[in-house]
């Protein structure tokens, strides 16, 4: 059943807790058989309003990648008593991440992390987001499609979609794609193109979409982490229309345009 929330808009469908939950505190944990999972957590909020962010790393990288790529996101999340989780390994990689760094089974791990954080750390069911770089950017985009019943928004840094995916029956998550110039953000695929593929898929769904071409190279969007955090804050689950539907807020990165 939908999780009731005090705010308006549609309610996300949160998975049930199954089995033991981890302790949400800064450090490295093993959960559901996966080691090396990094957790950045703020002091538990007094009421259920905190954010939760998945960070998915790139090929050949590790779960600690977020500290450099998404520093402003981590700071924002933890300052509000929220949780950022970054998996290191996979239950079994597949094409959802492009290079089999992560795979569909990891979505089940994500389901439990979300369910546990809502129950145990006062995370707001409407504030579940995903970001990541390269293979992780592809996976963040696809996770949000395949878990649109509760994911509020995705903001991949050189990510998008290499091939179409079907959204779940419910949910219209927002999207902010960050990428380099065409021909300059290429590792096997052109991430400006995969970003455009995702932009079009989400737009067709009815989502609010922002496209940010920073003009640089692969995973060069770390400087937009502050803008990603603003985007997440403004787009909890079910936000429609976007408060930014007519214009991006003052001071937002000029590389970004409403799609």
Where are these regions (language model features)?
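A domain-start/cap signature at the N-terminus of enzymes
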Residues: 1-52, 83, 102-105, 131-150, ...
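Serine-hydrolase catalytic machinery in alpha/beta-hydrolase-like enzymes
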Residues: 18-24, 30-40, 48-127
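Soluble non-cytosolic domains of exported or imported proteins
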Residues: 47-50, 100-108, 145, 189-193, ...
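Cell-envelope and extracellular/periplasmic
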Residues: 56-63, 118-121, 133, 140, ...
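Mature extracellular/periplasmic domains of secretome proteins
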Residues: 71-79, 143-144, 165-167, 199-201
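Solvent-exposed, polar/charged alpha-helical surfaces in well-ordered, non-transmembrane soluble domains
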Residues: 108-115, 119, 145, 196, ...
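The feature captures the conserved acid-bearing segment of alpha/beta-hydrolase catalytic domains
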Residues: 149-229
């Amino acid at each position: 059943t939908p999780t009731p929330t005090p705010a308006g808009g549609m309610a996300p469908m949160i998975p049930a807790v199954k089995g033991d939950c981890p302790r949400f505190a800064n450090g490295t944990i093993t959960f559901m058989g996966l080691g090396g999972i990094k957790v950045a957590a703020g002091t538990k909020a007094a009421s259920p309003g905190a954010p939760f962010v998945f960070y998915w790393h790139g090929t050949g990288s590790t779960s600690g990648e977020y500290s450099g790529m998404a520093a402003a996101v981590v700071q924002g999340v933890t300052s509000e008593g929220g949780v950022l989780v970054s998996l290191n390994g996979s239950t079994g990689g597949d094409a959802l991440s492009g290079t089999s760094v992560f795979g569909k089974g990891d979505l089940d791990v994500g389901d439990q992390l979300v369910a546990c954080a809502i129950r145990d750390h006062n995370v707001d069911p409407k504030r579940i987001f995903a970001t990541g770089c390269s293979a992780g950017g592809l996976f963040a985009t696809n996770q949000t499609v395949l878990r649109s019943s509760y994911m509020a928004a995705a903001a991949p840094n050189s990510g998008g979609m290499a091939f179409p995916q079907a959204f779940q029956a419910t949910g219209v998550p927002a999207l902010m794609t960050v990428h380099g110039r065409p021909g300059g953000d290429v590792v096997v695929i052109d991430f400006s193109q995969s970003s455009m593929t995702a932009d079009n898929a989400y737009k067709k769904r009815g989502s609010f979409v922002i496209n940010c071409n920073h003009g640089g190279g692969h995973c060069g969007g770390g400087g937009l982490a502050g803008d990603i955090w603003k985007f997440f804050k403004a787009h909890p689950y079910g936000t429609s229309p976007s408060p930014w539907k007519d214009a991006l807020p003052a001071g937002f990165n000029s590389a970004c345009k409403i799609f």
